[in-house]
């Protein structure tokens, strides 16, 4: 029996294609050497925070596209995003615009999940708007890549430094002793673990660790408490330390905000999550943690980074968000009137459910059903939980 040729004999790059059979060769030729590459946004956010997640995905896209070009095939990316900003969500045209040059190649796949499907494509008007934004964004990216190529350079070394600072600060938070206890009390993650929503269970094996928790309920639970740390934590302290220790690097980032879509998109998205936080509601959920020392420790860390983030983004963008984004604030102001009432009902129901003994099965199940209905209502009001 004749053996199939080795990867080198078949013309495939060594190592990157460890074993290639004849059928695979024929299939690759039929696809004109186009390679689909999937990128994950959710677990990278949970593991390293939003800044490190976005920056490392950006680098991966750029480097993988270069590898494809070097070896004579075309890459296109499948973005495994979610509805929340923390998991890669956002305006489609801005999302595409923020990608590195020569990485879209007129082709892009993207996931749409949960309630985001109805929000984005639930009626002809919104569906038309979002599909037009996506296709026009791809067209614009392709045109700009061909016109400018690699002519424009950005301070990527500074961005890598900022990303590392944000990553370290984020990891310090989630590795701080007592964090799991605070998280378990200050969010309704225990309710989400009992729910039947989603295609997979909230935890991979059932152990009570952060590593075992899936990224979707991680983001969902924080956002329901309006403690939106998954969308900004780490950036505030990272920017402040960069400004104090390397002011010239801080200024170099500021100078390219309007010309570097990736950086501007990151800052605007982060700012949106800051706007969607609510200090009063945040404190009410934090009060569910009955250990005052533990509660105060984590709320002080969270508030400190929140304040740094607001101040640093204001410096970078020259004006406070309230003067630049009046529409967003007006929108949240209208929704908050109803949301504050829903959050209070949710808090009362959550306390009642937690205090009900497990032996009272019917009573506990009835309260759980009520809780899930309230969560659905809050989710619809926040519009940042998918």
Where would I find each of the regions flagged by the language model?
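Conserved phosphate/anionic-ligand binding catalytic regions in large, soluble enzymes, centered on
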Residues: 1-3, 75-93
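Conserved radical SAM core fold
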Residues: 1-8, 41-47
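Carboxylate/His-rich catalytic cores and anion/metal-binding grooves
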Residues: 2-29
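Short acidic, glycine/serine/threonine-rich loops at helix termini
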Residues: 7-14, 47-52, 86-93, 120-122
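Acidic, glycine-enriched catalytic cores built around paired aspartates
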Residues: 26, 40-43, 51-60, 73, ...
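Structural preference for beta-strand elements that scaffold enzyme active sites
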Residues: 34-38, 74-76
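A structural motif corresponding to the C-terminal end of an alpha-helix
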Residues: 63-75
